[in-house]
From Swiss-Prot:
It comes from Halobacterium salinarum (strain ATCC 700922 / JCM 11081 / NRC-1) (Halobacterium halobium). GO terms for molecular function: DNA binding. GO terms for cellular component: cytoplasm. Encoded in a 14-gene plasmid locus called p-vac which produces predominantly short, spindle-shaped gas vesicles during all stages of growth. Plays a regulatory role in gas vesicle synthesis, activates transcription of the gvpA operon, and probably of the gvpD operon. Gas vesicles are hollow, gas filled proteinaceous nanostructures found in several microbial planktonic microorganisms. They allow positioning of halobacteria at the optimal depth for growth in the poorly aerated, shallow brine pools of their habitat. Expression of a 9.5 kb p-vac DNA fragment containing 2 divergently transcribed regions (gvpD-gvpE-gvpF-gvpG-gvpH-gvpI-gvpJ-gvpK-gvpL-gvpM and gvpA-gvpC-gvpN-gvpO) allows H.volcanii to produce gas vesicles. A similar region restores gas vesicle production in H.halobium without the p-vac locus, but it still has the c-vac locus. Interacts with GvpD. The keyword Zinc does not apply. This is Transcriptional activator GvpE1.
Length: 191
């Protein structure tokens, strides 16, 4: 027995990475080892599989400096929720398609936002109903992709322009108020 183990160990590449998720094991256990795609030709089942993936190096490079940024983590969940549609569209673009679980993880990593699936999924469904997103329904999840990237970018660009204008106006009004308050206090001390 020991000789057999040594022989098997010698055949195994120690540097090989073996990866699986608990859900993979659970689905095998529940199905008694039967394939979900046993009734399909081999290639058809392969196109319907989707594996959760971390952000690619290209995606991380796109968002470099933004991920796990302490300053972005100060943005409240309420503000993230208010602009969730545009944020989701950008995250889906960066990933070139994503499932809801990945988007929730990205929101947490980008903004420190602890949003529930009950907050995010209705927005994804609404965007799909509006035709902004295409949905690929798989056995255990949905994968969302932009149906019209240019239209989505136009929508996001418009929203960002409005936010910038709104922020600039608020900043200008606040600066005026502070200046008037300061002048008012200066006159009171001179009197």
């Amino acid at each position: 027995m020991d000789d057999l183990l040594e022989e098997l160990t010698a055949d195994i590449d120690a540097n090989a990475a073996i990866s699986f998720a608990v859900t993979d094991l659970e689905s095998v256990i529940e199905s008694d080892g039967a394939s979900d795609h046993a009734d399909q030709p081999p290639d058809e089942g392969a196109t319907q599989r989707y594996t959760d993936t971390p952000l690619t190096d290209d995606a991380v490079a796109t968002m470099d400096g933004w991920l796990d940024n302490d300053q972005l983590h100060t943005i409240s969940d309420a503000i993230v929720t208010e602009h969730i549609d545009e944020i989701l569209l950008l995250l889906i673009t960066v990933r070139d398609g994503a499932c809801g679980k990945e988007l929730l993880q990205d929101l947490r990593r980008l903004f420190g936002a602890d949003l529930s699936p009950g907050t995010v999924y209705p927005h994804l469904n609404d965007l799909a109903v509006e035709g902004v997103l295409e949905v690929q329904k798989l056995s255990k999840r949905k994968v969302y992709r932009l149906s019209d990237p240019e239209g989505a970018f136009t929508r996001i660009d418009h929203m960002v322009d409005q936010l910038l204008l709104f922020s600039l106006v608020l900043k200008a009004v606040m600066t005026d108020c502070k200046a008037r308050q300061s002048q008012s206090q200066g006159r009171e001390t001179n009197d």
